[in-house]
UniProtKB/Swiss-Prot annotation:
It is found in: Mitochondrion inner membrane. Pfam families: p450. This is Cholesterol side-chain cleavage enzyme, mitochondrial. Induction: Induced by FSH or pregnant mare's serum gonadotropin in ovaries of estrogen-treated immature rats in vivo. GO terms for cellular component: mitochondrial crista; mitochondrial inner membrane; mitochondrion; perikaryon. Keywords: Cholesterol metabolism, Heme, Iron, Lipid metabolism, Membrane, Metal-binding, Mitochondrion, Mitochondrion inner membrane, Monooxygenase, Oxidoreductase, Steroid metabolism, Steroidogenesis, Sterol metabolism, Transit peptide. Belongs to the cytochrome P450 family. GO terms for molecular function: cholesterol monooxygenase (side-chain-cleaving) activity; heme binding; iron ion binding. It comes from Rattus norvegicus. Interacts with FDX1/adrenodoxin. Gene3D superfamilies: Cytochrome P450. The keyword rRNA-binding does not apply.
Length: 526
């Protein structure tokens, strides 16, 4: 594994001299040709950006030989150590410029224009084009993207909409607590020990469908609908089978009828068929209803708004469902993992949650506003374990970064994983320390938190995910002490999103009943 045993220093270079503060113990950084900031007035050419070479196929051969496919985040770190804070790399026929300094990221995003373009996953595009599937904001661009995005923002990003999600997500989180208590009862050992990744997938799917449709699918019941489980499995398979086709033309995989392509297409087929079935069923159910005593969900609001054609609504609902399972569940698993490794931090978070419960008198909508450290722990988790290892933009106009002129239409990628592990931006970067995000200094946080992207093209489900994770963690911290069975690092692998290299086995120890008695629920007297 590249990160283990890789002895590196800070990659930020000034006047071609490495900083003295090491990120990892070991040999110093090779500055590379032009790795520093040039003092000349005119920018240097694109070809002068440090690079492993211009033959993309030779580069790809070495990349694959080193098993870089599932360790691309470590590959980025290694290249920054070799070439400095900016480099370009061509793998196959795709060339990118990579940066990691938050100031460079700020420059990039400030020039992205009103309709930013980002990298589209090639096998996803190939599937949608070949099977002529409808597309939503994930794949759209220019005015078509903007029209859909403006409408969707009103339903899933606006504060007035977000508050409607609280009771829905609180109910799902409480049912997850019941799942853990069932596991404890089944093991009959006073605690639950095991891998909860499948339960987290079901929790995430139940959460996103609850928000979208305003009703529950029952994914946290003892008996789970096998068809709904098929959707969850398909999302995982879709991510997993994407990786081999990132650097080779997906059409080759399709023409040669490879298992990778067949599995990938089959996964998307299930995603579309199930999402369409859910949407159609809830659409007809909603048409029969007249009295809504609770928020009826995003789908109902979109249909009632008459601002998007039904086919556009279907496409965007499909993308929201597909994007709301593995991403959120993985972040929660990493957060639990970090809390279990850092029990003092866990106790600080629990104390904040209990104080918030008392102050809010059990009102979850108020509670989520009273847990800044808990929210910071989510930021800290995404710093160490970002869902996406890079954020990408195709630049609209020529752009100068670190005194190199980058031509328009070039793909520039902000290496979020490498940035999060860089000591120049995050002192003691391997330490899980949520308090670092509570500092008010712009120098501490400016463009350092990019867990959900940035700007108008940031993650559409950001507010849902943040609220979902906050409510989940509140409930878990109130009810359980979380530990891990092994203190050894599980490592990470790239399956389009970052995942643990091996299963994480947790211990969930119920807190004493007298502790729970100090936690009033909404409506309780205090």
């Amino acid at each position: 594994m590249l990160a283990k045993g890789l002895c590196l220093r800070s990659v930020l270079v000034k006047s071609c001299q490495p900083f003295l503060s090491p990120v990892w113990q070991g040999p110093g950084l090779a500055t590379g040709n032009g790795a520093g900031i040039s003092s000349t007035n005119s920018p240097r050419s694109f070809n002068e950006i440090p690079s492993p070479g211009d033959n993309g196929w030779i580069n790809l051969y070495h990349f694959l030989r080193e098993n870089g496919t599932h360790r691309i985040h470590y590959h980025h770190m290694q290249n920054f150590q070799k070439y400095g804070p900016i480099y370009r790399e061509k793998l196959g026929n795709m060339e990118s410029v990579y940066i990691l300094d938050p100031k460079d990221a700020a420059t990039l995003f400030s020039c992205e224009g009103p309709n930013p373009e980002r990298y589209l996953v090639p096998p996803w595009v190939a599937y949608h084009q070949y099977y002529q599937r409808p597309i939503g904001v994930l794949f759209k661009s220019s005015d078509a993207w903007r029209k859909d995005r403006i409408v969707l923002n009103q339903e899933v990003m606006a504060p007035d909409s977000i508050k409607n999600f609280v009771p829905l997500l609180e109910g799902v989180a409480q049912d997850f607590i019941k799942v853990l208590h069932r596991r404890i009862k089944q093991q009959n050992s006073g605690k639950f020990s095991g891998d909860i990744s499948d339960d987290l997938f079901r929790f995430a799917f139940e959460s996103i469908t609850s928000v979208v449709f305003g009703e529950r699918l029952g994914m946290l019941e003892e008996i789970v609908d096998p068809e709904s489980q098929r959707f969850i499995d398909a999302v995982y398979q879709m991510f997993h089978t994407s990786v081999p086709m990132l650097n080779m033309p997906p059409d080759l995989f399709r023409l040669f009828r490879t298992k990778t392509w067949k599995d990938h297409a089959a996964a998307w087929d299930v995603i579309f068929s199930k999402a369409d079935e859910y949407t159609q069923n809830f659409y007809w159910d909603l048409r029969q209803k007249r009295d809504f005593s609770k928020y009826p969900g995003v789908l109902y609001s979109l249909l009632g708004g008459n601002k998007l054609p039904f086919k556009n609504i279907q496409a965007n609902i499909t993308e929201m469902l597909a994007g709301g399972v593995d991403t959120t569940s993985m972040t929660l698993q990493w957060n639990l993992y970090e809390m279990a490794h850092n029990l003092k931090v866990q106790e600080m978070l629990r104390a904040e949650v209990l104080a918030a419960r008392r102050q809010a008198q059990g009102d979850m909508a108020k509670m989520v506003q009273l847990v800044p450290l808990l929210k910071a722990s989510i930021k800290e988790t995404l710093r160490l374990h970002p869902i996406s290892v890079t954020l990408q933009r195709y630049i609209v106009n020529d752009l100068v970064l670190r005194n190199y002129k980058i031509p328009a239409k070039t793909l520039v990628q902000v290496a979020s994983y490498a940035m999060g592990r860089e000591s120049s931006f995050f002192p003691n970067p391997n330490k899980f320390d949520p308090t670092r995000w509570l500092e008010k200094s712009q120098n501490t946080t400016h463009f350092r938190y990019l867990g959900f992207g940035w700007g108008v093209r940031q993650c559409l489900g950001r507010r849902i995910a943040e609220l979902e994770m906050t409510i989940f963690l509140i409930n878990v911290l109130e009810n359980f002490r979380i530990e891990v069975q092994s203190i050894r690092d599980v490592g990470t692998k790239f399956n389009l999103i970052l995942m643990p290299e091996k299963p994480i086995f947790f211990n969930f120890q119920p807190l004493k009943q007298d502790l729970g008695s100090t936690m009033p629920r909404k409506g309780d007297t205090v």
